Design a protein with these regions (language model features):
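Conserved sequence signature across two-component system core domains
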Residues: 39-42, 61, 76, 100
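Non-catalytic signal-transmission and effector/linker regions of two-component phosphorelay proteins
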Residues: 1-38, 42-49, 54-56
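A structural signal for hydrophobic residues in beta-strands of small regulatory alpha/beta folds
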Residues: 130-133
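Helix N-cap/capping motif at the beta->alpha junctions
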Residues: 45, 59-66, 90-93
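A short, hydrophobic beta-strand element within the central beta-sheet of small alpha/beta folds
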Residues: 95-124, 128
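A short, well-structured beta->alpha microelement
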Residues: 51-73
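Conserved phosphotransfer microenvironments
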Residues: 70-106
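Short acidic, S/G/P-rich loop/turn micro-motifs used as interaction or catalytic elements
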Residues: 43-47, 80-88, 115-118, 137
Length: 138
């Protein structure tokens, strides 16, 4: 499923229900049913069960085996630290974001982290459609 434009209206992950989709599903329930979400995080993703209960199609991976692992998903929520190690990426999740941005320009990327990074990481964060702290309320 291709989403040419997604605009996040609020500041929480649950606000994915407030997405404005120019072409695609006609309702929020259709978006939940058809938009697939991949979470790449080496830690437990606490909101996963809540999002699933609310009808979201969500999959959690601790790391990627190959970059092709992201192909089936429309929205990728990627941690910055602790992921990308299997692929040997020096900048871990930041490099995953760069690769998704370059290889899959129609995917929506959310950088998700609990750390503050030095300005060298700004180039990676700018490739994400949205940057969210891990303590974001859901």
């Amino acid at each position: 499923m291709r989403f040419p434009h997604i605009c996040i209206m609020m500041n929480t992950l649950s606000d994915l229900s407030e997405l404005s989709v120019l072409k695609g599903p006609n309702s929020i329930s259709e978006l939940r049913k058809y938009a697939s979400i991949l979470v790449i995080d080496d830690n437990e993703f606490a909101p996963e069960s809540s999002l699933k209960r609310n009808g979201y199609q969500i999959q959690h991976k601790i790391d990627l085996d190959t970059m092709k692992d992201v192909e089936p998903y429309d929205i990728i929520l990627c941690d910055i630290s602790g992921v990308g190690k299997k692929l040997g990426f020096k900048n871990e999740g930041a490099f995953i974001i760069r690769e998704i941005h370059a290889s899959y320009p129609n995917k929506r990327i959310i950088a998700y982290t609990s750390y503050t990074y030095n300005p060298n990481y700004n180039q990676f964060f700018s490739m994400a459609d949205f940057v969210a702290p891990k303590d974001l309320a859901i």
